[in-house]
């Protein structure tokens, strides 16, 4: 039997009982003695006795008609009542908002402590993207909001780094975090990499050209450079110049990638080519050294990617080309600093291995000067695309080691092209992002209309405190309203004094804006998609089992970044440990201080 038919039969069974009952009433009235209505009513008792002498229904036409008519009338009355019934939700008239409990978060916690993202003192989120019950699956993208001094680093970044379950890409304003957690990561056999745009001497080298594989990669690199070096007050009238610059950069980088020797594939070569691209307004036939390079390449490969781009650039007249070159020079002015050119001369980052083995990459940037933040943005953009491509092409869609981006001061990194699309697709590839801001307005200032898309792709929101009005308003609205009881008392004074008492239901925000702004500094608000919000204590890092390895617990655990980089470079220069007896080799003696020798032994 079909479920719908079965449901209708069950629904109408009570009306069959009514038909039976009223059929018996009709039978009793029919069997009662008497010639008229009054006489039958006097003997109705005898009629009921006769009718119910047998439990079998009466099949007399009159009795059946009375029973069926009564059942139909009752069904119509019930239908009318249901259709016009008032909908009462007692205790829920204005809202059902409430704070979450331990039972609400329990399905989302992994029993193994290390396999969780730490959110608050009592709430955690399992790292697995495939829980036993699919309805409990949540992405690991987290939006963390907290004003200055609210503890974004202490209460969120450090606890989650101490979990040691993933590779980490960590933005580190001021460069203090690596010193505090580096010793812990080294003990756990993590490969540590650092890009420092504050002090280049304390940084490993990063060369974006080392990660160019296809023409698409070249276009992405050019786009990231354009987006993050446009300067202040860019006007729509500059569109032509920007497009012309894009063609020029694409042509030069394409030439370098496909034609230059390995040691010349870097920004230094790009700058040298731009500097050699002089023009003469009075001589349209003048050929500079770069023109000659492309002429020779065109003779050999007319359909070369770089040649196609350069042809389009060369459509500009001499005066226009000179203006384009001036724009290029202004855009790449930071590369006039020798330390930056040296930093990006070759690569030590090994970005394409971060999803293969546990790695911690620290991106140190200034929180007061954004001059070199475009370097961080280029790396972030390249890394995200590299990881996604490797997951798809090598590992069948999922990286073997989960990669977590912990992006402190996210608003200061610069704009990562297509980030709104990337954050929507990285979950399935075992990549997640924790976006840390001082207020939501920072995100809107950079990503504008795409800011809401980015927020919408974060299943978790953690508010650590702040007083920015827009943020307070949005959080208060998200928390919703609860229904509360209220009563008013009144007193009327006249010839006689009378008192009144009035009870009513009211709707109240679970937490008003002023309550959020003035909440205790040790408390936070957690919102997980599909779950009631939590008002909980911030995570106490001193209770973490690995806290003792941080410099917070013991200054002896302070990580020496310069020494680590120096030792890593010396190790790379050492000859291979295993050489065949017949294999010729050169032997180099490298002097290490006792301190450096101990450092290597510790690894």
Annotate each PLM feature.
Residues 20, 99, 241, 487, ...:
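A residue-identity detector for tryptophan
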Residues 51-54, 63-116, 215-225, 272-276, ...:
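Short alpha-helical interface patches
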Residues 113-119, 374-382, 475:
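Conserved long hydrophobic alpha-helices within structured protein cores
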Residues 423-525:
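Conserved ATP-driven motor cores of ASCE-family P-loop NTPases powering translocation/secretion/packaging/pilus
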């Amino acid at each position: 039997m079909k479920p719908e038919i079965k449901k209708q039969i069950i629904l109408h069974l009570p009306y069959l009982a009514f038909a039976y009952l009223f059929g018996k009433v009709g039978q009793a009235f029919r069997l009662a003695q008497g010639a008229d209505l009054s006489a039958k009513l006097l003997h109705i008792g005898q009629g009921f006795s006769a009718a119910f002498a047998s439990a079998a229904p009466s099949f007399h036409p009159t009795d059946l008609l009375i029973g069926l008519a009564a059942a139909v009338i009752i069904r119509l009355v019930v239908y009318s009542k249901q259709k016009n019934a008032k909908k009462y939700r007692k205790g829920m008239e204005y809202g059902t908002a409430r704070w979450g409990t331990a039972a609400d978060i329990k399905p989302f916690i992994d029993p193994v402590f290390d396999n969780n993202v730490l959110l608050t003192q009592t709430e955690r989120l399992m790292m697995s993207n495939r829980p036993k019950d699919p309805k409990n699956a949540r992405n690991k993208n987290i939006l963390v909001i907290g004003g200055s001094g609210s503890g974004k680093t202490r209460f969120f970044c450090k606890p989650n780094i101490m979990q040691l379950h993933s590779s980490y890409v960590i933005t580190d304003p001021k460069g203090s975090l690596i010193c505090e957690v580096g010793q812990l990561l080294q003990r756990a056999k993590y490969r540590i990499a650092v890009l420092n745009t504050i002090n280049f001497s304390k940084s490993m080298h990063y060369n974006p050209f080392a990660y160019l594989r296809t023409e698409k990669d070249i276009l992405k690199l050019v786009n990231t450079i354009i987006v993050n070096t446009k300067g202040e007050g860019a006007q729509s009238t500059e569109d032509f110049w920007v497009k012309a610059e894009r063609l020029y950069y694409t042509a030069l980088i394409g030439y370098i990638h496909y034609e230059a020797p390995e040691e010349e594939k870097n920004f230094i070569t790009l700058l040298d080519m731009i500097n050699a691209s002089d023009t003469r307004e009075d001589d349209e036939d003048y050929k500079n050294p770069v023109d000659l390079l492309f002429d020779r390449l065109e003779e050999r490969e007319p359909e070369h990617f770089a040649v196609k781009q350069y042809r389009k650039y060369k459509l500009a007249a001499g005066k226009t080309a000179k203006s384009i070159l001036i724009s290029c020079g202004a855009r790449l002015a930071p590369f006039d600093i020798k330390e930056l050119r040296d930093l990006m001369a070759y690569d030590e980052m090994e970005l394409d291995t971060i999803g293969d083995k546990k790695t911690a990459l620290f991106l140190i940037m200034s929180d007061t000067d954004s001059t070199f933040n475009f370097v961080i943005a280029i790396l972030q953009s390249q890394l995200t695309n590299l990881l996604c491509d490797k997951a798809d092409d090598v590992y069948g869609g999922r990286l073997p080691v989960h990669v977590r981006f912990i992006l402190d001061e996210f608003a200061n990194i610069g704009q990562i092209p297509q980030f709104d699309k990337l954050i929507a697709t990285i979950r399935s590839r075992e990549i997640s992002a924790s976006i840390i801001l001082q207020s939501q307005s920072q995100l809107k200032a950079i990503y504008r209309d795409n800011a809401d898309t980015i927020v919408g792709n974060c299943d978790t929101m953690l508010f650590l405190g702040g007083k920015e009005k827009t943020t307070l308003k949005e959080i208060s609205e998200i928390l919703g309203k609860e229904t509360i009881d209220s009563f008013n008392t009144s007193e009327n004074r006249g010839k006689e004094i009378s008192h009144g008492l009035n009870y009513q239901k009211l709707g109240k925000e679970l937490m008003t804006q002023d309550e959020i702004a003035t909440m205790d500094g040790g408390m936070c608000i957690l919102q997980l998609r599909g779950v009631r919000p939590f008002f909980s204590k911030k995570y106490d890092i001193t209770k973490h089992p690995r806290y003792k390895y941080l410099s917070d617990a013991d200054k002896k655990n302070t990580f020496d970044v310069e020494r680590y980089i120096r030792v890593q470079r010396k190790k790379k220069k050492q000859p291979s440990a295993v050489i065949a007896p017949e294999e010729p080799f050169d032997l180099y003696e490298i002097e290490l201080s006792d301190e450096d020798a101990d450092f290597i032994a510790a690894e």
